C-alpha cells in the first residue's frame, strides 16, 4: 500500500476530506510527522496544539487560528479528541472564545459556538500519557453535525451561560454550569485580562473565557457512532 501524502491545498469536497482523514487512521503521530518532514516533540507541555497542527497539515486545513472553520470552503471544523484505550474522551473539547461584551441581539442561530459546531470532523487520537507521543495512533474519523436533540441541548446550555454573561454574572460561572457546554477561563497566565460586564452593569477586567464541550457530550457522540459499549 502506498504511503499517504499531506494535502497541499484545501480539500474541495467533504468526500475528499474524509477520504484523506481515513487514510491517516492507524498511523502513529511519529510516522505522520516524519512523512510530513516534522519533528515530534517529546511531550505536549510546550506544544499543546501540536497534534492539531500536524493533522491540519495532512488535511490541507486553511483557517489557522482565524475565527472561520478550519475548512472554510466546506464549512467544516476539525477537532482532534484524545481518547483512552476504550475510546472514551480524556478531556473537554475547546470550541471557541466566549464573548464577554457586545452581546446584545446575539442568538443561538447566529452564535460563534453554533457556527463552529455546525459540521465537525472528529479525529480520535490515543491520549493516554503512558503512551509516548510519537507512538500514539490516530483513530477513525467521524464527520458529524448535531442532530435535533444535540442542537437543543447545546442551545439550552449556551442560552443559560450567555444570560449569566449579559447579566454581569461572569465571575459566578463555574465549570458545573451547563449540562454539555461549559465556560472556563482560557488564558496562559493570570495577567491576560479582558473586559466584561460586572454585576451593576459596570466594566470589569476578568480572565478570558472559552466555551468547551463536556466529556459526557463527546463520549456519547463517539459511543453512538463507533458503537463503543
Swiss-Prot record:
This is DNA mismatch repair protein MutH. Gene3D superfamilies: DNA mismatch repair MutH/Restriction endonuclease, type II. It comes from Escherichia coli O157:H7. Pfam families: MutH. GO terms for molecular function: DNA binding; endonuclease activity. Keywords: Cytoplasm, DNA damage, DNA repair, Endonuclease, Hydrolase, Nuclease. Belongs to the MutH family. One of its GO terms (cellular component) is cytoplasm. The keyword Nuclease applies. It is found in: Cytoplasm. Its main location: cytoplasm. The keyword Endoplasmic reticulum does not apply. SUPFAM superfamilies: Restriction endonuclease-like (SSF52980). Sequence-specific endonuclease that cleaves unmethylated GATC sequences. It is involved in DNA mismatch repair. One of its GO terms (biological process) is mismatch repair. Disulfide bonds: none annotated.
